[in-house]
Amino acid sequence: LHAKTEQNSIKILFLQKISAMAYSWGDDRRYNSYSAYFRRRFGERVQKVAINAGFSCPNRDGKVGFGGCTFCNNEAFTPSYCQPSKSITQQIEEGIEFHRRRYRKASSYLAYFQSFSNTYAPLEILRSRYDEALSHPEVIGAVIGTRPDCVSEEILDYFAELAKSNYV
């Protein structure tokens, strides 16, 4: 019984020591949460505002397949304000209002190009849509969802240029 109690005491001390450690990201959690990362990086709560920029995907338009991927059901995770018939600016404005009602602490936003493959278009179109989003005064950066086979060197160069003055 004494040996078992001693073992339990050692386990408890070990767990306390682990939980008291600060990890390289400055937190005592074993993982670096996205919200904590943004709070450290920007000094405030940052909220993603989803945007549907009207892009398609090679698994939808016939280049690779039809019907899309099983896991990519945009209707399941797209907010009601997020419609490709609306301008990027209008979606951002409506998204910010939505998040202000829901998360009152957010004061800066990331334009989240979420629906489908957001690099599956000519660079001029991408540039126009990303620039429109990044020109909004409350948007501090962009999060761009895509497929690796839809990212060219030219697009990567553009992202590198954007990243000099924006969070990308």
What are these regions (language model features)?
Residues 20-40:
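Short, Gly/Pro- and small/polar-rich lid/capping loops
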Residues 41-87:
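Canonical Radical SAM [4Fe-4S] cluster-binding loop centered on the CxxxCxxC motif
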Residues 75-95, 99-123, 138-151, 167-168:
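Core AdoMet radical
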Residues 100, 131-137, 159-167:
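Acidic (Asp/Glu)-rich catalytic clusters
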Residues 123-131, 152-162:
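Distinct, well-ordered alpha-helical segments
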